[in-house]
Amino acid sequence: MLLIAGLGNPGPQYAHNRHNIGFMAADEIFRRHRFSNWQKKFQAEIADGVIDGEKVLLVKPQTFMNLSGQSIGEAMRFYKLTPADLVVIYDELDLVPGKLRIKTGGGSGGHNGIKSIDAHMQSFPGGQNYRRMRLGIGHPGAKELVHNYVLGDFAKADNEWLDTLMGAVADNVAMLARREDNSFMNRIALAMGDGNQRPGGVKTDPAQLEKAPPKAQSHIRQARQNQKKPNIPESGPMAEMLKKLLGKKD
């Protein structure tokens, strides 16, 4: 069995928060695949289904973000799962909006939901070696702005990339069931149009790259290139005198 946990805070007031992007991903997986109805168990909303022959349990902890580990640990103990059977989906400040990364193990990066899960995973064989799917939401630019930023709603301008990302995650979730994490990340990057992007989401026209302007030259080099060559006579008395001075032979 694969347990996919999306992190967030319960309640309609938090539904569209950046901090709830994990819940959003779980909801989209639920909508695009055949799952049982949501039910309340393990201090969470859960739904079970089968993806690519693998039984999958979706979990949305209802404990609030900072206690997410209580719910996930309870579900894992009930089904006798190990950290290798767990994928956690959550928001990442240090990735630009729309970027996705998956890694097995690692630190919490200051994320309180991950801190809670890490603490509860210590009692399982394999400890903190579960898969972490980080979904980029961007950073507000200053530490003191982070709290209000993550608990703020996504802007309308974010809807296009957010809908594309959620759809791509849900459509390719079978790769997670097959443990094909690198292929999954590549598929998401293609869906998000990352192939020809500069930082900041500005797409690069390949034609512009082919016609890149020449490197700038220093003013000294330009002066040398523009300097006229001296007009040296090839015959006559002056030419003969120059040959003697320069030691030039006929």
Curated annotation (Swiss-Prot):
The family database entries (Pfam families) matched by this protein are listed as: Pept_tRNA_hydro
Any single GO BP term:
rescue of stalled ribosome
**Entry-linked CDD domains:** PTH
Q: Name one GO cellular component term.
A: cytoplasm
Subcellular localization, as worded in the UniProt entry: Cytoplasm
Enzyme Commission number(s): 3.1.1.29
Task: Kindly list the cysteine pairs connected by disulfide bridges.
Answer: none
The positions annotated as site (Stabilizes the basic form of H active site to accept a proton) read 91
Q: What class of enzyme is it?
A: hydrolase
Sequence ranges of Polar residues compositional bias: 219-229
**Broad class of the protein's primary localization:** cytoplasm
Its domain of life reads Bacteria
Where composition is biased (Basic and acidic residues), the residues are 241-250
Q: Where is this site: Discriminates between blocked and unblocked aminoacyl-tRNA?
A: 9
Region annotation (Disordered) ranges? 192-250
On whether RNA-binding is a keyword of this UniProt record, the answer is yes
Q: Which reactions are catalysed by this chain?
A: an N-acyl-L-alpha-aminoacyl-tRNA + H2O = an N-acyl-L-amino acid + a tRNA + H(+)
A molecular-function term among this protein's GO annotations: tRNA binding
Describe the subunit structure: Monomer.
Indicate the family of this protein. Belongs to the PTH family.
User: What the protein does?
Assistant: Hydrolyzes ribosome-free peptidyl-tRNAs (with 1 or more amino acids incorporated), which drop off the ribosome during protein synthesis, or as a result of ribosome stalling.
Can you say what this protein is called? Peptidyl-tRNA hydrolase
The scientific name of the source species is Brucella canis (strain ATCC 23365 / NCTC 10854 / RM-666)
The gene that this protein is the product of is pth
